[in-house]
């Protein structure tokens, strides 16, 4: 770090600093917690009286749920010396654990007691408050005899750069206001420039000291996330619409039913429990919980990564690694559409942080590892299976290196990674990379060599418990749809194993084969992305395979990185694997581990190029080059990464090509304006039930415990099947009708109709209506009989009627919106006029009307291909039944 501090214009005197107290006493902690608790009660009481104070309750509620339970748990565990950053990270992780556990336990207890509304304001508030007060008592009794402070958090903070950083997220609020209100994106462009300036100030050792690097990481993360999430008053993206719908159903019904939907997200507590509780406690609409609170929680992921990298490399490398992670577009565009994965990645990062932490008590470390692992299970099934695969392979490699007969493997680790039995590590004189990464050349390091994680942290028992818990959870929630999907994925991969690197089944290969969009800047963008991958590959290879070089990366992390790189390659090569999560999301997940290797690869390659250049210039008589000093390389890398960010977020495209995206304009098709939302809500409230014709229904019955299929017929124009049956023998028969999914409507089964032949016993059910499937996309099927007590030989007329939600057609983005509002039959595509079902409606949003086009999506293998088509032919022979100058509905 340079000893000179500077502003943008001159070298100022030493900046004023503020020192945060180095201790938090038991008395002070309990006083703050109880004050927040009482303030929350008062605010809720005022709300009951009809007095609402804007901003205050959402802020107090957020702080209460996000920090208070976790801080108290840390105090009970006497985890005093974590430092302020790790204290915040673990406190948030433990607070989320407490909140999710409360929601799950209440659901189980209320279901057992047959009480209907565990997710009500009074129930949630009482439960959380009771647990907080209980934790306060535990904190008091476990620490009252210990004179030491609860937390040691001493840190010197320069006031001017701190205030400068803290202002930046508020600029995001202002810049998005300009876009939403005036459709002006200049504020967004300016803010991206400010972020670039912050990165360069850090790289050039100006203004911002290293103590503020974690704050800078958080500020950059939350700013670029808010630049996206605060656009529009509605949510952006596909998955998050379904997540909102499920969470809203919990709030509306006051209860979470684990099997109320076949949608896999219904088993994710990170959506169906966490969001409703935040909404209730903070008095914040569910939309804004997803748009504000979830991004704030997700912004802690890069902060956690900074701690992981800082424990192994120097602070500058840790910061630039985090900035690269945040600069990848999926971080701020794709992840904001996946609320469950935002929470899951936080738990995943906490697991890795535990792996590289050496200061923590081993028993507490193991307990936290298990807790965060279980929370990952109920947060995101895809990321959990990736994580447990990584952990299992890491355990396997490290176990082989430990046990007898593994001398060859151990020798490989010693020679390839640089671990020596004498615990003396020497960097060769020609190797200058470690200086820039926190290791000095020509210096013997006498500290013990890194060792694998404690046996109690990553063991086969821990991994087995997590896997069994996940299997049980995914089997018993969301009607087992997660388990079905995983089995289907494995089957698809196994059945197509001969199609390695086939672009039809690999999104990454398809993108590379298709090449970039025409235009110089698009080609530069593609080249930079390929270059990033090259630097990461080079970095991993340098660590693992190059002899006699030693980095401060721990052995478990190196093994984890190698496994992660292998998974990334497999997601490209294996059919269906990358597409299951979407390949850009897979790449974003792997960056959690691989981000620092871009820095390592960049620096080493530049140093090698510098050596060659130096030799050439020396022979030409120009002397030795000093252009590749460590500090200059860090600055060069910072400039490169800022350029990468400005390419990824559309800044350079906006300046040179007038390009618009959702962060810069509301006049793009993936942004829902007020008129489009109003029109969609009108359609949702005016949808009708229509008969389903041309659908096959099977009528079956049980007699003496044996199932018989009676008939299978097609519904007529009225959605009915009418048929007669004559019985030749007496006895009881239980009839029901069933409809099998046809790709548009889900399975549905009617209730039982008892038919007692040759007896005067009256059936209690002459008409059965479907109740088996409560999904909005499931049709209703009714079965009735003309009589349920016929005589032998007397004909009985059975009537089956199949009805379903009215079909509403919309383009790709509007279909997502309509589905989130509960329209179970919002469909794509508009390819041919004769595909439009009778009795259906067509919904057009603002973008469709202004451009007279609709966006449809085709699939070529696993690759989604977007196509804009003219809408005139679809609406020319239909009646306009709704219009608000920004949305239209045709019948």
Regions found by a protein language model. Give the residues of each.
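Membrane-embedded, hydrophobic transmembrane alpha-helices
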Residues: 2-210, 414
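Transmembrane alpha-helical segments
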Residues: 383, 601, 633-670
